Regions:
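Extracellular/surface-exposed low-complexity segments
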Residues: 1-19, 172-181, 187-287
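Glycine-rich repeat segments that build the extracellular carbohydrate-interaction surface of secreted
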Residues: 3-5, 17-36, 50-60, 87
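Short, solvent-exposed loop/turn segments that connect beta-strands within catalytic domains
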Residues: 21-23, 98-100, 128-129, 198-200
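A generic structural signal for beta-strand entry/edge sites
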Residues: 24, 50, 74-76, 84, ...
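Extracellular beta-strand-rich solenoid/capping regions of secreted or surface-exposed proteins
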Residues: 35-52, 64-88, 93-114, 129, ...
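Solvent-exposed loop/turn tips at the surfaces of repeat/solenoid architectures
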Residues: 49, 56, 63-65, 70, ...
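Ankyrin repeat (ANK) tandem alpha-helical domains that serve as protein-protein interaction scaffolds
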Residues: 143, 168-170
């Protein structure tokens, strides 16, 4: 295990990591630090590496150590070329103040996997009502796994997590919460994007695989899941699924709230559509 207490030490530990997917390089965070405003666009690039970062835990306060960025035009982590990263018992502060699609706190690119374990917390920022801050961007064929009490929260305008059409979100625990301030439509936390190719539609795979925290509250922002104010796009009916080993109940359906549907430049609020439980899946239908 490698102990790091500065951004420079963490960068070096990542660059020299030689772990595998089954036995990732173990890095222990031994102190809180900020990433300087003059840092590279991606402060920590994880290119084909397999890494697990855990918190050494502040011996005085017992609180998690944290990584934060001083400028919201920088991204903290980027995973590329099949990389994997697990973050446990640490806090990340995005300190974002405005929306920009290329400055998510964490980018998970194609074929990469990010796991957020127990004790992880991400606060992406404090934007204005018309901003769209992104905490984590999950690209096509990329995977985000949330476990235990992992939490992503506290931005004003949702998109705490943005999942591309062939992206995967596995909920083995965890919660993604919007901060309940500003206008009603600004309270979104999970954005799912569909892709349209002729008559074919591709949508993200979202599964609930274990018990979720009692205060889980996923506020959904769906893109291209509907055709109009009264019609769900064929093939885009299923929003969340259970698994063979975990069956959804209506109490789980109530942890997911449909806030907005956007298609063709039009946004439809929850007065037009609703979520309902159908077998082991949460689906969308017109009211």
């Amino acid at each position: 295990k490698t102990l790091v207490t500065t951004a420079a030490e963490l960068k070096t530990a990542i660059e020299t990591a030689d772990g595998t997917a089954d036995a990732p390089t173990q890095i222990i965070l031994g102190g809180s630090f900020e990433v300087a405003a003059d840092a590279e666009h991606f402060a920590f690039s994880i290119d084909g590496k397999h890494i697990a970062i855990d918190d050494g835990n502040n011996p005085i306060s017992g609180d998690n150590y944290s990584i934060s960025r001083t400028a919201s035009d920088k991204s903290l982590f980027e995973l590329t070329n099949g990389a994997s990263l697990k973050l446990t018992n640490l806090n990340i502060y995005g300190n974002a103040a405005a929306h920009s699609a290329d400055v998510a706190c964490i980018f998970v690119r194609a074929s990469c996997k990010l796991t957020l374990g127990n004790g992880f917390e991400l606060y992406s920022g404090d934007g204005f009502v018309d901003d769209q801050l992104i905490g984590i961007s999950v690209g096509d064929n990329a995977t985000l796994i949330m476990e235990g009490d992992a939490e992503i929260s506290k931005s004003i305008k949702g998109q705490e997590v943005l999942v591309a059409p062939t992206g995967i979100l596995q909920l083995k625990g965890g919660k993604i919460k919007a901060r309940e301030e500003g206008t009603y439509e600004s309270e979104r936390s999970l954005c799912l994007q569909a892709a349209i190719n002729g008559n074919q539609v591709t949508i993200p795979t979202v599964t609930v695989e274990n018990e979720l925290p009692a205060d889980s509250d996923f506020k959904l922002d769906l893109y291209d899941y509907v055709l109009s104010s009264s019609t769900v796009r064929p093939g885009a009916e299923t929003v969340v699924k259970g698994t063979d080993s975990y069956t959804l109940t209506d109490s789980y359906r109530m942890k997911f709230h449909l806030m907005t549907n956007t298609t063709g430049g039009m946004t439809y609020y929850d007065s037009y559509f609703e979520l309902y439980l159908d077998g082991n899946a949460i689906k969308i239908r017109a009211k």
